[in-house]
Amino acid sequence: MTNSFADFAKAKMIFVIGSNMTEAHPVAASFVKQAVLAGAPLFVADPRRTALADMAELHIPIRVGSDVAFLNGLMNVLITEGLYDREYVQSRCNGFEELKAKVLEYPPERAAEISGVSAETIRTVARRLASVKPVMLMYTLGITEHTCGVNNVLSCANLQMLLGNVGFEYGGVNPLRGQNNVQGACDMGALPNVFTGYQRVDNAEARAKFEEAWGVASLPDKPGLMIPQMLE
């Protein structure tokens, strides 16, 4: 995540997509609720009407699996209407022309056909996101657990960079993980291919460092098995 929970509570505007936070991440959601109660506008894009959507300025019921088209539609409006942060993009981002060429293929009308969200709603959301700085974006497994999950994540990041919302307090991209403390477990090295801090077991320098720190003669130099490999 690029923001802390303390940032969540003080956000100026929040965009939640593919996340039933109130049930899956109630602690994180409590900070979002604090921000909303303090006046931060909230937009929730989710096929279902979740409890968090009831607190939103607007619930956007996109079709399952249409996230990229919907996000491309938003970015199309930002670019064609000149609402994106031109200075931020020019000074901090790469690949803008390639992104522009792609999202211009998704005017709101085409994005609406795919996502089920009206073209007018797409325009409204894009304009609202551009009206406040910074905006904080959050997503969960509703974005990642798809065959197009990587593209979903890239689209979320591209949207925030286009708006100039990455690298600032109260503005960023915040993925909430899928299982209880999976982030902390991974950070600490509870994975079959890395030590603490994602330092690979097949890296001799990393092994030597942890052998010395842990006071052991040798550590495994081959990655262990992932769950699919165990099942096989």
Predicted regions and their residues:
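Cofactor-pocket helix-loop regions in the catalytic cores of large enzyme subunits
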Residues: 1-180, 207-232
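Surface-exposed loop and adjacent secondary-structure segments within mature catalytic domains
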Residues: 181-202
